[in-house]
């Protein structure tokens, strides 16, 4: 046991790793001790990464129509979610989207596709995209996230210039059957190992807030350490309407900070990324989280909106950090004053622009079998993307793309009542949601819980509207 986080940080810096019991104690730090925990984790962050922040940018190559049954995912085929659905972007379309993030300061582009895993033909489409991107931007890192890999596919990606492969474990092995029944935890581990064997940098992380216990969260973090993940994205569950986990709210900004700090203590020298859901769950504590993490995604996510890129860059600069590979001011000439930054301040704190970890941004293997939803020629995305619900012009104006898709705030009871009760849900997840076996809540926790609907992405890839990068 340890007396305080600072002493434990001293020990970690001296080369002695934390134990699971110590990590559990850190996770259960009371709120008055939270700043001491963050300060100790910040020492570990600065030791290995200084005051830099790595900026990553997502390009959603194929959206929705996924046959896997991951309980958190808005891209599952039978989810009643109102997301964009489209087939594979062409290499030219994908490079065009990547350009937005690169101009915004991203040093890594993440190419993501929904689906259980790619066919060899689809891997060929991705390699052509990577080659085209690297021809124009040879120094930009490329991370692929395509689901479960077959023999030889990781080698093909590596030969084309892919630097890293993302496939999240998402949760603890002891909790996995409660989240998904169409593939196993070991399937995910095997894909990460295939990527490593091919020389790709392994990227694997978590989705927190899926009714896991504190013990299971610690179990998952240590599994990521043992897996040897170079990059650990931490997603915060966004309970999309129409998914089995709709109405699941167990995170507060303070709890999110504690989770990030625990990941830093367990993986002190790894890239830790605050990923999907940070805007909704960390809210006004995002700048403080930068003292623990050293990486984030810029702009929108796969199926939902993120904080405006200008607000992200201003947040990084205001907190005293610099974007990795950029000058001293990461937002450069784009760094407007507070009144000029769109989507920042109280608007962001209110959760109006929110995100969800869904589909493959989480490194998910969730998705349709190879080829589901693909265009006949295997390459071109249709001009008009489809979406569930009534037909509506997508991208008629930037305002339409950023404001009209989200819907008003929901109370906890309303959100919970809208959750599915069986259809398309694994038996283990149905049992968990119908039981009292979820994480215990503090009886004295009187904080106001903010619960808002995610805002569905209507811009960027698959639309005619520019992204918010």
Swiss-Prot record:
InterPro entries: Aldolase_TIM, BATS_dom, Biotin_synth/BioAB, Elp3/MiaA/NifB-like_rSAM, rSAM
Pfam families with a match to the protein in the record: BATS (PF06968), Radical_SAM (PF04055)
EC numbers for this chain: 2.8.1.6
Keyword annotations of the record: 2Fe-2S, 4Fe-4S, Biotin biosynthesis, Iron, Iron-sulfur, Metal-binding, S-adenosyl-L-methionine, Transferase
EC supergroup of this enzyme: transferase
Names of required cofactors: [4Fe-4S] cluster; [2Fe-2S] cluster
Biased composition annotated in UniProt, kind: Low complexity: 363-384, 405-428
Domain Radical SAM core: 51-278
Reaction catalysed by this enzyme: (4R,5S)-dethiobiotin + (sulfur carrier)-SH + 2 reduced [2Fe-2S]-[ferredoxin] + 2 S-adenosyl-L-methionine = (sulfur carrier)-H + biotin + 2 5'-deoxyadenosine + 2 L-methionine + 2 oxidized [2Fe-2S]-[ferredoxin]
Gene Ontology molecular-function annotations: 2 iron, 2 sulfur cluster binding; 4 iron, 4 sulfur cluster binding; biotin synthase activity; iron ion binding
Cell inner membrane in keyword set: no
Region (Disordered): 326-469
Signal peptide range in chain numbering: none
Annotated metabolic or biological route of this protein: Cofactor biosynthesis; biotin biosynthesis; biotin from 7,8-diaminononanoate: step 2/2
Binding site for [4Fe-4S] cluster: 66, 70, 73
GO biological process, one term: biotin biosynthetic process
Gene3D superfamilies: Aldolase class I
Cofactor annotation remark: Binds 1 [4Fe-4S] cluster. The cluster is coordinated with 3 cysteines and an exchangeable S-adenosyl-L-methionine. Binds 1 [2Fe-2S] cluster. The cluster is coordinated with 3 cysteines and 1 arginine.
Cited SMART domains: BATS (SM00876), Elp3 (SM00729)
Chain sites annotated for binding [2Fe-2S] cluster: 110, 143, 203, 273
Family: Belongs to the radical SAM superfamily. Biotin synthase family.
Subunit record text: Homodimer.
Purpose: Catalyzes the conversion of dethiobiotin (DTB) to biotin by the insertion of a sulfur atom into dethiobiotin via a radical-based mechanism.
Family matches, as PANTHER family: BIOTIN SYNTHASE, BIOTIN SYNTHASE, MITOCHONDRIAL
Name the UniProt record assigns to this protein: Biotin synthase
Naturally occurring in which organism (per UniProt): Kocuria rhizophila (strain ATCC 9341 / DSM 348 / NBRC 103217 / DC2201)
